[in-house]
Amino acid sequence: GFLDVVHVGKAVGKAALNAVNDLVN
């Protein structure tokens, strides 16, 4: 459902932010 898509989107966003954080630090 729509909420599942939102949940997956948030998870992907967090993973991307963490990856960028690791590269910066």
Curated annotation (Swiss-Prot):
Q: Keywords of this protein's UniProt record, alphabetized?
A: Amidation, Amphibian defense peptide, Antimicrobial, Secreted
Please give the GO cellular component terms listed in this UniProt entry.
extracellular region
Q: What is this protein called?
A: Cruzioseptin-13
Q: Which tissues is it found in, per the record?
A: Expressed by the skin glands.
Family from the record: Belongs to the frog skin active peptide (FSAP) family. Cruzioseptin subfamily.
Q: Which residues carry this modification: Asparagine amide?
A: N25
Query: What functional role does this protein have?
Result: Has antimicrobial activity.
Where is the protein situated, by its record's location annotation? Secreted
Which biological process annotations from GO are given for this protein? defense response
